[in-house]
Amino acid sequence: MEEPESQPRERRPGARLLILGPGAEGVRLDLFLAAELDLSRSQARRLLERGAVSLDGRPLAPGDKGRPLEAQGELRVEAFVAPADQRIPQPGEAEAPPSVLAEGPGWLALAKPPGMPVHPLEEGEKGTLLGHVSALRPEVHGVGEGGLRSGVVHRLDVETSGVILVATEDAQWDRLRGAFREHRVAKRYRALVEGDVQWPGDRLELELPLRVARHKPAFVRVASSEEAARGRSRVIEQTMQKLETLPGASLVEIEPRTGFLHQIRASLAHLGHPVLGDLRYGGSRRGGAHRHMLHAAEVAFEEVRAAAEDPDDFGSVLARLRSAESDV
């Protein structure tokens, strides 16, 4: 988990600062870079070949690619700046733009449609949420991490729909990133899950040690007691409430207090209730779920507040289940 920085650091366009914690211990450098930066292993190794990676201020070489990391330290990745017309995320030509839910000085809240990436992974990629934001608010360019991640405060999986925050000023980016890092942002998700959830009082307070078991494609599982004891996991916390019992499924609400890769999807699968449509974690196509039925319904931090209605596909699956017209 990243810790708040004690003093402001120089921000360079495209530079990434990665704080190493317990979850990084023993992980190969190239695998860690690939997972954290959404790269392939070959792309991560090319960063090393170009001298773009340093650890605690010491440049790393290509021969360090298999080096196991420790549970502390700072990795800095210097991105290579492309021509300006390529660095700006481009909106898609055919996609409907995500709707603006709320906005204030230096920030926007948008409703991310399912299937739309938050930001591009390479120059020239179109159809991302940030591409639409850059067309709507050009001042986002260079904010925060800059480059292809300009203004991005947090992320949602590509298939997950719902509220996403983007900063259009550096001061707001610092403030909001700090709030997410310190778990001061209230988040509420809705999910359609397999089976009839049986929790005492239809409510469950959950703490689980999770770890990334595979990076490409990412897969998260509950850590063994030995892995947890060695610090190779991260304890996640969330509150879950069953809202409705459906034929072969349940509608649940999740309020995560921590933020970890696939936290909600992996924890629900561990409990025997994978998200409908989430084939990676054991979910089925029940109700015609063509993607994982997980929706970020609300985000709130001080005056920054926004809520998003269920998208059409989520509502359609819910309606089919309610009328017992499931495909399964």
What are these regions (language model features)?
Residues 1-328:
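RNA pseudouridine synthases
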